[in-house]
Amino acid sequence: MCRLLGYATAGFDLSLHAILGSQAVGEYRALSRIHNDGWGASLLSNPVEPAQLSDGGAPSPETGTRMYRSTLAAELDPVFDQIAEEPVRGALFHLRLASSNLPLILENQQPFFADGLSFIHNGDISDEQGRNIVTLPDSPVNEKTFLSTGGRSDSAMFFAMILECIGSGIPLDESVAQAVHELRRICPKSSYNCMVQSQDQLIVLCAAGHNEAASRVVEIYNRYGRGGKVRDYRVISYRALSDENGDPAGVVAASSGFPQDRNEGWTPLKNDEMLIASNRTGRFRLRSI
């Protein structure tokens, strides 16, 4: 059970602070008082050195990818400030609240990364008997693919299913959609809200199995005196970005939990709706799964 945030620009570097403003970044970070089981980020940027430069080792990359994952709560980790100030072309941020008693280990921290893709997920993937998908006797994914994610959780299994679809030659957005369809056969009422980042695209999906927050999540939020924040727990909203001239400059999307005023351009995704954005042009579109 996590809080997700991601953005894609029109090919230039912007920091999270530049996109949201310091107050909103602070309120997002403050969610880690509850979502305190670690955090992580995946950042895409344009390297200073020319692409494909032969420098004695592997040729220099066209896109630089950096990952950070920690078992510390974001509010207690000074690295969060540094990363939130880092100008990048695209980014994912993840605040974790561990589900189904899955262990608080670095392997289960998100984003996961494999085959050039970063992945974050909000939801507990369990069947109607309450059994987490990683405990079921028959795995829906190949073990080798599952291990390639580096994780051991239900979220890692979701990512592995996406990777298998991509390996069959299916485009990224359709791979995410097909992975959800396959997993819903086993765990129909689970949440598959997620974000995936490649060197070219940001995929944001709202795919909740039901509208109500899980009773465990409600209990935890009430314990922290923030029960009012749990009402729209499964909502993901997005806002188009503009540059200083008012021209389109990309898109930002995030889970609820901090102010996302519709008067400021925030729009909730419908359930089973996906946003597909380019982190090179900033253009984005919506589709149903």
Positions of PLM-derived features:
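N-terminal segments that mediate ammonia production and transfer
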Residues: 1-119, 125-289
